[in-house]
Amino acid sequence: MTDFLSSVTRKLTCKTFLIERMITMEEHTVDLLRECDSGCAMAAESLEQIRDFVSDQGLWNEITASYEKHQDLDLRIKKTLRAMEEQGKEPGKMASAWSWMSTEMRMMAKGGAKEAASIVTDGCNMGIKTICGYKNQYSGASKAAMELADELTGMEENLRNHMKKFL
């Protein structure tokens, strides 16, 4: 009888562990996707804003192409969240306001392609640091969510590299 109870207890403990792990994975997946959603939206807002100041056609094209890629990725992230019956996350109001204000001030003070590229580079670096931090925080997220986060950081790294010729 004791062996039987020990066996049942082990099986229940194992099942409980697996259920808890699945719940944690789903929570981490949703949280990571929400942060990626917010990051994509923040990047797109910033790129759209800075684009209005840019007169250099090459820089404008780079920013526009990246804006469209961020929009496309954000749609895929939102679709994934909807499939999980979850909502996305908007960028924080204070972060958005600060980003908008600092961009406006920097572009009014200095302006030009060099300053625009510098602002975009700073934004890319912030995005990379932020999303990598969330990947570490939500390390239990699904492989698909991690891949979307990697795609976002890859886009930021690519855009940052394309900005070098304008700095």
Model-derived segments and their meaning:
Residues S6-M25:
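Short, Lys/Arg-enriched N-terminal segments with co-localized hydrophobic residues
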Residues M25-V54, E115-S139:
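Alpha-helical bundle segments that constitute or directly flank the non-heme di-iron/ferroxidase center
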Residues E27-C36, Q57-L75, A113-A117, K143-M155:
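Alpha-helical scaffold segments that form or flank carboxylate-/histidine-based iron centers
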Residues D37, A41-A44, R51, T64-Y67, ...:
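Generic structural concept
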Residues A44, Q71-D74, K78-L81, S102-M105, ...:
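A structural signal for well-ordered alpha-helices, especially hydrophobic packing surfaces
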Residues Q49-N61, Y134-E147, F166-L167:
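Inter-helical turn/loop segments and adjacent helix faces that build the functional surface
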Residues L75, K79-I128:
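Carboxylate-rich helix-loop segments that flank metal/cofactor sites and access channels
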